[in-house]
Amino acid sequence: MVNLGNAVRSLLMHLIGLLVWQFDISISPVAAIVTDTFNSSDGGRLFQFPDGVQNWPALSIVVIIIMTIGGNILVIMAVSMEKKLHNATNYFLMSLAIADMLVGLLVMPLSLLAILYDYVWPLPRYLCPVWISLDVLFSTASIMHLCAISLDRYVAIRNPIEHSRFNSRTKAIMKIAIVWAISIGVSVPIPVIGLRDESKVFVNNTTCVLNDPNFVLIGSFVAFFIPLTIMVITYFLTIYVLRRQTLMLLRGHTEEELANMSLNFLNCCCKKNGGEEENAPNPNPDQKPRRKKKEKRPRGTMQAINNEKKASKVLGIVFFVFLIMWCPFFITNILSVLCGKACNQKLMEKLLNVFVWIGYVCSGINPLVYTLFNKIYRRAFSKYLRCDYKPDKKPPVRQIPRVAATALSGRELNVNIYRHTNERVARKANDPEPGIEMQVENLELPVNPSNVVSERISSV
């Protein structure tokens, strides 16, 4: 049996040796150092690099580990430093990235070490249940985070007013703490069981794997299948609510446009028949200001719904990837327990060894999903890879003082409005009317033209 210090050094030397050996660098000095260092203390159990043979799967695993750790560190940095990402959903995604990063730091390297030793556990035996517990903890935390995100978004869309009361940063942290508490509660029994009875965590007294059928069944349903069912149901309910809100908004907006057209028609008729428009009787004096408020509301509401749809699309891809990556492992794990000796146990073990690594790969895919489908994450990752860690500064806002009512010609009105806004003007420059009254109040103009211009025009 090796001690913990030698085991850690052995793992590091194996990783270095793999990289050097894989790229055909002269490895005889490295092999000699590794052999001389560990053969004396490791009882001759050091994994030997065969001459002329390259272990491409092992190198691929090393690359996956590096990408998993690096990608999730970028996600954590983006949510921490970008103010645009400071919301409940992204706090959950940052906590999920922490779990995935810990998978790359603590779980994957030990699993690679087990592969290099041909699934014979090379570390102290008491570390086996600890490693299994960490594996279950982070896997459970991943599915619980996705389940919590799905529930939180559904409640936010279904009852936005009620949800806004509980959507502060503190409340989001409390929800994340509950997710981690549930995950810890699922994984804590493993080291307790394993330290009392090593047969529960060792197969053939050599391979470190969870060997308690009851815990495998209960843990699989509690940690995977039940949260997965909740996540899928709430996700489809969210899509349904968004579609219904879109249809209701479009129908309401269409009716409003018809009402506006009717009102404009009445005003034009009154102007032709009665001369001045301001002297024409308005059938509903309150219609005009109310119409102005309604014209702005559908645009903002539709934009909010479109943003929710985009976010739901990204999260849906994350959910789908997680489902595809982890379902094979958990289904095979349950089948191996239910069928017992009727199944080919060697085949089941090989399938589980492959499927568990497919699940590990999921921890490194999420940052790629964010990069492909979210511009804010993509820009943040690009900045950090260039070693630019300065947060984006908000553009300054210029305050335009209140302008008194002034008689302007049509051409002057066009010039002044086009100078301060990109919106089209109702009257053309060659309007035959000599002048019109205009008053601008509370006009805010950001330097960045992409921002929304807020202005109020009356007495036109």
Curated annotation (Swiss-Prot):
UniProt-recorded name of the protein: 5-hydroxytryptamine receptor 2C
Pfam family, one: 7tm_1
Organism encoding this protein: Rattus norvegicus
Function as written in the Swiss-Prot or TrEMBL entry: G-protein coupled receptor for 5-hydroxytryptamine (serotonin). Also functions as a receptor for various drugs and psychoactive substances, including ergot alkaloid derivatives, 1-2,5,-dimethoxy-4-iodophenyl-2-aminopropane (DOI) and lysergic acid diethylamide (LSD). Ligand binding causes a conformation change that triggers signaling via guanine nucleotide-binding proteins (G proteins) and modulates the activity of downstream effectors.
Annotated compartments: Cell membrane
Transmembrane stretches, start-end: 57-81, 88-112, 130-152, 169-190, 215-237, 314-338, 350-372
Family annotation (PROSITE patterns): G_PROTEIN_RECEP_F1_1 (PS00237), G_PROTEIN_RECEP_F1_2 (PS50262)
Compositional bias of kind Basic residues: 289-299
Cytoplasmic topological domain residue ranges: 82-87, 153-168, 238-313, 373-460
Any one GO molecular-function label of the UniProt entry: identical protein binding
Ranges of the Extracellular topological domain: 33-56, 113-129, 191-214, 339-349
Quaternary structure note: Interacts with MPDZ. Interacts with ARRB2. Interacts with MPP3; this interaction stabilizes the receptor at the plasma membrane and prevents the desensitization of the HTR2C receptor-mediated calcium response.
